Amino acid sequence: MSKTLQSIRGMHDVLPADTPAWQWLEAAARELLAGYGYEEIRMPIVEQTELFARSIGEVTDIVEKEMYTFEDRNGDSLTLRPEGTAGCVRAGIEHGLLHNQQQRLWYMGPMFRHERPQKGRYRQFHQIGVETFGMDGPDIDAELIILTARLWRVLGLKDVRLEINSLGSTEARAAYRALLVQHFEAHAEVLDEDARRRLHSNPLRILDSKNPAMREVIRSAPSLLDHLDEASRAHFEGLKALLTAAGIEFTVNPALVRGLDYYCRTVFEWITESLGAQGTVCAGGRYDGLVEQLGGRATPAAGFAMGLERLLALVEAGGARPPAPKPHAYLALAGEGTQAEGLRLAESLRDALPGLRLVVNGGGGGFKAQIKRADRSGADLALIIGESELAEGTILVKPLREAGGEQQAVPRDGLAEFLRARIG
């Protein structure tokens, strides 16, 4: 007996019973983003490995441990994208979208990281990413946050809270980095292996550690907010004022640093406790140096990404899972000549009634078996064509969801109007 093949660990099939919820979420996001003037961009899921090493940072968990990297037949090192911002910036530079232009872009699709699979965390996961270019002020940071807050309302999410921070300029961060190294070196005995590894390469990431044994040394660390440059401080105060004016509640978290090296100034996360352990459902910030870092001209930029699996889990935890759409009608056919007539009728109904969900019986079978299939499909009506209906030019309509509903013969040329009245 041959081995049964299964999906790769951490990579899941989305089955027909679940796809309506995905489609509903995706449609809500599409409509909202269009309303704010954002345009869709689609990038490859495979990029040169160098793109992520240069953008995310070589001394990060993603690049060091989590990327799916392989060598193609030409000897080039390629990587399945672990996030979308770097690819979006690469596309913007390559196609001339960014020079002296403002852009509001978004994308949707799978990302890949070789992490330990757990609740809300997968090796193939899906994100909606939003990126803005050419806008330097705190107003665009506020717009991104306000946009996500509106999406939470559209989706009926309540158990999410916003944390914000500022990482300052590159120069201010370098000076703060030296202070941080000095602080952690003085408490080296409590640092875990991961923190010691990061101490001289990426000390800000130590602030993001979840190790309870390091909680006190992290809490007592100097705050980056106390060492911001004046421009970054003014930018952050402007953002806080705009969010307050918009009625957006937030908490300033000085330990919020984000896991990607390209962030500067504003960073933010939307967090929930509704999925068990604290989880981030949306995160972003500014990355003003990334376009130049990847070979373009200096361009201010900001964006965010949200995980669809986590959002769907939140929606379902709140009891708001959208119902799966069911067929309006199921067409049952039995007898000589009925299949050809049934296919012609189905197409004429689809022409007359855009949006009609009509399933035509396939694979034959008697009327009894077909009506059982119709019932299992969830259709409201069974449309029946037998040899007698074919000869008389009628369709027998049988209600499937009405207690005591009586079947009736409807003339073929009046069926479209009959269905329009039933389905609206």
Swiss-Prot record:
Key words of the record: Aminoacyl-tRNA synthetase, ATP-binding, Cytoplasm, Ligase, Nucleotide-binding, Protein biosynthesis
PROSITE patterns assigned: AA_TRNA_LIGASE_II (PS50862)
GO MF annotation: an example: histidine-tRNA ligase activity
GO-annotated biological processes: histidyl-tRNA aminoacylation
Keyword Zinc: no
InterPro entries in UniProt: aa-tRNA-synth_II, aa-tRNA-synth_II/BPL/LPL, Anticodon-bd, Anticodon-bd_dom_sf, His-tRNA-ligase, HisRS-like_core, HisRS/HisZ, HisRS_anticodon
Enzyme Commission code: 6.1.1.21
CDD domains assigned: HisRS-like_core, HisRS_anticodon
Compartmental location: Cytoplasm
One Gene Ontology cellular component: cytoplasm
Organism superkingdom: Bacteria
Reactions catalysed according to its record: tRNA(His) + L-histidine + ATP = L-histidyl-tRNA(His) + AMP + diphosphate + H(+)
Record-linked Pfam families: HGTP_anticodon, tRNA-synt_His
Family, per entry: Belongs to the class-II aminoacyl-tRNA synthetase family.
Subunit and partners: Homodimer.
Name of the protein in question: Histidine--tRNA ligase
Source lineage: Bacteria, Pseudomonadati, Pseudomonadota, Gammaproteobacteria, Chromatiales
